[in-house]
Amino acid sequence: MKALILVGGFGTRLRPLTLSFPKPLVDFANKPMILHQIEALKEVGVTEVVLAINYRPEVMLNFLKDFEDKLGITITCSQETEPLGTAGPLALARDKLVDGSGEPFFVLNSDVISEYPFAELIKFHKSHGGEATIMVTKVDEPSKYGVVVMEEVTGMVEKFVEKPKIFVGNKINAGIYLLNPSVLDRIELKPTSIEKEVFPRIASDAKLFALVLPGFWMDVGQPRDYITGLRLYLDSLRKRSTNRLATGAHIVGNVLVHESAKIGEGCLIGPDVAIGPGCVVEDGVRLSRCTVMRGVHIKKHACISNSIIGWHSTVGQWARIENMTILGEDVHVGDEVYTNGGVVLPHKEIKSSILKPEIVM
C-alpha cells in the first residue's frame, strides 16, 4: 500500500519552531511529528510514503533518510511549484500513487495526532464498497467547523454543512482518508480543496463513507493545540503502553522522559511533560504541561508550565516560564527572569522579564 502525507507550506502558526525545521520535523512527544504517522502506516503494510510539500523538501528527505532504512519504507517527495490546496497535490502525485494494483491509498494531514486506527479503516473501507472513506471525530462545539452529516448505521456521508447555525451533527473531518485510485480521476491539477470540492461530489454519488475515529484526536498545528495534544497523547500512551512513561517519587501524572536525559534531585515533573534527548534538568526544577526539546539545559529551581522550550535552549536558575511561552531554537533565558507568554525567535538571549505576551525578535 501507499500513502500521501499533506505536508503543506511554511508552518507559520507554529513559529518560532518552524524557523528551524519544517513543521512535520518539529518534535512531538520526543520524535518528529511526521514519524508518528509513518510508523503507524508501516504497521499496516504501507511500503511507500509520498510527502506532498512546497517548502524545503531537501531538508525533509535528508532528515528522513535514516528512518527509511530503519523502517524499511520508501519516502519520496512530490513538490508543488505553487500551492495546490488539499486535492491538487493528489493529482500532482498521481504517478507515484497509482501502480496498477487497484489498492486504495491513505491520505493524511501532517498536523493530525491520534491513535491512527489504520487497520480498522482498511477493514471498513473494504466492507462498504464505496470509493472513499474519511475518518471523522466528535467535537463539543460543531458550529465552529464543517460538519459531516452521515448515516449512523452504514456510515454513508449524506452532506457537509459548513459552520452550522442549527445542530445537524457533531462529527467533523479528522484529516485521515483512504481512497480508491478512481478518486484521482475526479481531481484536476490545479488549486482544489478535497474537503469542499471533491468529497461533496463523491458524497452526491453515494460513494463516500465515514468512520468515527476512536480515541483522541488533535490538530497540533499551533502552540495551544500542541500542548493539549501532548496531554491527550500521553493519556493514550498510559492506556496502551504504560512502561514507556516515567515513574518515580518526582513524577506527577503522565511524563515522557528520553533515556539520555538527566534529571537532578528534588525535582517535580508533571503532569503532561515531554523531556527530549540529551536534556539536563538540574536540582529543584518544576515542570508541568510543557515540552522540553532535545539538548535543553534547565538550571536549578527553574519553573516551567504551559510552554514549549525549543532545541538547545537554556533556562537560568530560578527563572519562571509560563502562559504559553514558546522559545525557539538556542534561546538563553537568564537567571531569575520571568516570561508571561509570548514567542522568542531562535538564538536570542532574554536578560529581563517579559511581563505580557509579546514577540521577541
UniProtKB/Swiss-Prot annotation:
One BP term from GO: protein glycosylation
Catalytic activity as recorded in UniProt: alpha-D-mannose 1-phosphate + GTP + H(+) = GDP-alpha-D-mannose + diphosphate
UniProt entry tagged with the keyword Amino-acid biosynthesis: no
Keyword tags: GTP-binding, Nucleotide-binding, Nucleotidyltransferase, Transferase
Gene Ontology molecular function: any one: mannose-1-phosphate guanylyltransferase (GTP) activity
Known role: Catalyzes a reaction of the Smirnoff-Wheeler pathway, the major route to ascorbate biosynthesis in plants.
Protein name (Swiss-Prot/TrEMBL): Probable mannose-1-phosphate guanylyltransferase 2
Species annotation: Oryza sativa subsp. japonica
